[in-house]
Amino acid sequence: MYAVIVTGGKQYKVAPGEYLKIEKLEIATGESVTFDRVLLVGNGDDVNIGAPVVAGATVVAEVVSQGRHDKVRIIKFRRRKHHMKRMGHRQWYTEIKITGIQA
């Protein structure tokens, strides 16, 4: 069984037992989180597509950890002017483990 969920403005295909890094959620480690914006639920050849969401479908996950991704380096420069600006950014994430899909 698998599902497609929406969180943090992104779509993820998930299945029970999978680990996933999503945009940061303000939930403590060890707690469970429920996603109710489920776009699609599939089980073998039986696929249920929502319009826009599947009614009554939820995905339950457990928060494993919070952290930050690797640094993304950004360089801006102006040609022929001896001007260069180096910047970096580390995005926060929440790692979750999918524990169940109810459809």
Swiss-Prot record:
GO molecular function: rRNA binding; structural constituent of ribosome
Biological process according to GO: translation
Residue ranges of the TM segments: none
Domain of life per record: Bacteria
Gene Ontology CC annotation, any one: cytoplasm
Pfam families for this protein: Ribosomal_L21p
Keyword line: Ribonucleoprotein, Ribosomal protein, RNA-binding, rRNA-binding
Keyword Ribosomal protein: yes
Record-annotated disulphide pairs: none
Protein role: This protein binds to 23S rRNA in the presence of protein L20.
Family, similarity comment: Belongs to the bacterial ribosomal protein bL21 family.
HAMAP family cross-referenced by the UniProt entry: Ribosomal_bL21
Assembly and oligomerization: Part of the 50S ribosomal subunit. Contacts protein L20.
Protein name, as recorded: Large ribosomal subunit protein bL21
Lineage of origin: Bacteria, Pseudomonadati, Pseudomonadota, Gammaproteobacteria, Pseudomonadales
Gene behind the chain: rplU
